[in-house]
Amino acid sequence: MSHQTGIKANAELLKFFGKCKDGKTRVLKVSIENEELALVDHKAVKKDWEKDYDALVKPLVEDDVPCYILYRLDYKIPTGYAWLLLSWVPEAATVRQKMLYASTKATLKLEFGSSNIKEEINATTKEETTLKGYQKHKIDFSAPAPLTSREEELAEIRKSEVKTDFGIDTKQQTLGGINCPISDPTSQALIDMRRGAYNYLQFRIDLEEEKIHVVNAANIDILKLPSQIPKDHARYHLYLFKHQHEGNHLDSVVFVYSMPGYTCSIRERMMYSSCKGPFSATIEKHGIEITKKIEIDNGEELTEEFIYEELHPRKLNLRPQFSKPKGPPSRGAKRLTKPQAVE
């Protein structure tokens, strides 16, 4: 996500990430401040993790202010103590805040050390940030032992094969496609676009969690659209193209899949190719009718003329020219007949 938001941990936070794994720190709070991840507060271990939980976490959770909370559990893994990542993004948060925190979480995990984070909670209500909320989350989302990356890929392929429906709605499934889940901010951005708040959305697949996130929601002039296309990573885009055609005003939603060739990894190319069908179906389930799907490898292609031609291809007038048919062949000189006299 750092490719889009540019938000990374500041020097103080990076230094504390190294220090907090000594076993003495129980919890730390991280927020996005001045376009960087910053350490807001931290508390030392006092009792066991269950007794410390509500006493230390509750004071860190503010009503309408999103944050990340990293909480040290008491069991160990090969790299040290296991940690819980609590992402607190309340419903009252703005769409921009939701997008920022969803888009920056992968960077936070990477800089803290993904292998140390063994559990995650995405909380939108204060009840979900309590010990009871954590215990309920464990019950609701209890799962088998973690799979390797290869096992996860195979499981996704099998799941997509099982879910393929050969009935009337087969066209919505895309045979062999992977149905990546979408984040809450992504769903909200689609709803907002349907209501007319934006004319452009850009989406990214988080390859680590295999989830689709919105990374840009804006009103973009058609002339500035090519500059929105990344040159080093694949993306999905939605653009509301308003134009005139044959005297009629049309509002056409164009789904664009941009893939800048071999600058992307094989896994990235495979994921974007596999997810585009199910994702476009998800978009339409949000009430947005896609008029045209376009694939490009260069943002410079995405001009007003190009989109117009894709929506309204020119019909070539190739009527065959028929020559005048020839008359019957000559049968010799015409005979003159005298009219007979009337008696």
Curated annotation (Swiss-Prot):
Domain ADF-H: 4-139, 177-312
GO MF annotation, one: actin filament binding
Region annotated Disordered, chain positions: 317-343
GO cellular component: actin filament; cell cortex; myofibril
Gene3D superfamilies found in the cross-reference section: Severin
Keywords of this entry: Actin-binding, Cytoplasm, Cytoskeleton, Repeat
Coiled coil location: none
Quaternary data: Interacts with G-actin; ADP-actin form.
Annotated PANTHER family: TWINFILIN (PTHR13759:SF1)
Protein's UniProt name: Twinfilin
Source organism: Aedes aegypti (Yellowfever mosquito)
Gene: twf
